Regions:
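Acidic, Ala/Val/Gly-enriched low-complexity intrinsically disordered segments
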Residues: 3, 17-19, 154
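Extreme N-terminal starter segment of soluble prokaryotic enzymes
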Residues: 22-26
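Short glycine/serine/threonine-rich phosphate/pyrophosphate-binding segments
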Residues: 30, 70, 132, 155-160
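Glycine-rich nucleotide/cofactor/substrate-binding loop typically near the N-terminus or early
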Residues: 47-119
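Short Gly/Thr/Asp-enriched flexible loops that form oxyanion-binding sites at enzyme active sites
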Residues: 39-41, 45, 149-152, 156-169
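N-terminal amphipathic/hydrophobic targeting modules at extreme N-termini
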Residues: 1-11
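Anion-binding (especially nucleotide phosphate/pyrophosphate-binding) glycine-rich loop
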Residues: 93-156
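Conserved small/polar residues in nucleotide/adenosyl-binding loops
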Residues: 177-178
Length: 178
């Protein structure tokens, strides 16, 4: 059995039989930013292995690092996709989604405050995580008792203040002024 990284975002597990023939290959790819999702990468790699080693059982298991694609990985494992209207990183309305598995919500910050949503407007003084808080509030209102929050792929630098505000927190100065 051999395990190791091929690249920073792709791991593999290879098993050979007694004759040294490749019997099973498990491919564990993350996404390739801006080009392939982890599912697309896994499917492509699986096909390539099967073309080169037809006797090999190749299995792709998509993974994510908490950014884009995290929710999709849970959806592939049977979670339900839940959509909600939220505020985007620059105040625009948008529909974001999270995964629900029993009473657990898996929310990726990228769905409400991700880099692709910035569309070139990289302005850390204006970008907010408010929509992420709205997703958390939606999940809680729908009965989720646990929240898993993936923090990758954000276009914000508000330290979660927008998220906390959406959940009811108030931020005051020394004079109790908002």
């Amino acid at each position: 059995m051999k395990v190791g990284p091929l690249r920073p975002n792709l791991y593999y597990l290879i098993g050979k039989d007694g004759d040294g023939m490749l019997k099973k290959c498990i491919l564990i790819p993350d996404s390739f930013k801006g080009t392939l999702t982890s599912q697309q990468a896994g499917s492509t790699l699986r096909r390539a292995v099967q073309e080169q080693y037809p006797e090999c059982e190749a299995v792709a298991v998509p993974v994510a690092d908490g950014g884009e694609g995290t929710v999709d990985c849970f959806l592939q494992q049977g979670a339900r996709k839940i959509e909600a209207a939220v505020t985007g990183p620059f105040g625009e309305p948008l529909t974001a989604a999270y995964a629900r598995l029993r009473d657990t919500a898996v929310i990726e910050i990228a769905s409400a405050a991700g880099l692709p949503l910035a569309e070139g407007r990289l302005d850390p003084c204006r970008a907010t995580t408010y929509g992420v808080g709205e997703l958390i509030a939606h999940a809680a209102a729908e009965g989720c008792r646990e929240i898993v929050l993936g923090l990758g792929g954000s276009c914000t630098n508000d330290a979660g203040i927008g998220m906390a505000r959406a959940l009811g927190a108030r931020f005051l100065d020394r004079k109790s002024v908002v």
